[in-house]
Amino acid sequence: MKVLVLEDTVSHQVRMETTLAEIAEELGIDIQVQVTGKIKEFKKYIENGDVNQLYFLDIDIKGEETKGLEVAQFIRHHNPYAIIVFVTSKSEFATMTFKYKVSALDFIDKDINNDAFKNRIKDSILYTKSTLIENTNMVDYFEYSYRGNDVRMPYND
């Protein structure tokens, strides 16, 4: 699983890396983590075609209160299926994720204790694993509705 983290505070970067490493070991899965506090570097990963399944974003980057939300829009533009999770101390911005239309999976407060923090990150990892990685046999369906009855049939049938 490829994870990209945007966090400008070193102590929070270390917390994320440590937490992700612990979860990877517990679950026995390979998690490739890339952490940066620089928006240009972050966007470069995405523009270069690096497909990450899961993104953890701080909202307030270098004093710009909504920069993380703008970055989430950038991610959504380049990868509409990405899983985005906000990890921030700006809990008052939770409702703004709807305004920016970024479809965030979760909004994790940095100030929660380490066990709760780890559990929330783990939930995001497990969700990503089950929806994007294990569901590789996704097929196209033909769907139609007739007289109130819905029919869904795989194209290969």
Placement of each model-derived feature along the sequence:
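Non-catalytic signal-transmission and effector/linker regions of two-component phosphorelay proteins
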Residues: 1-4
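Conserved acidic carboxylate
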Residues: 7
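Acidic, metal-coordinating helix/loop segments flanking the phosphotransfer/catalytic sites
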Residues: 17-18, 32-54
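Charged phosphotransfer/docking patches of two-component systems
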Residues: 10-17, 94
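CheY-like receiver
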Residues: 52-131
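Conserved binding/recognition cores within well-folded domains
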Residues: 119-157
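Alpha-helical interaction/dimerization surfaces of two-component signaling modules
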Residues: 19-23
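A generic structural motif
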Residues: 24-33
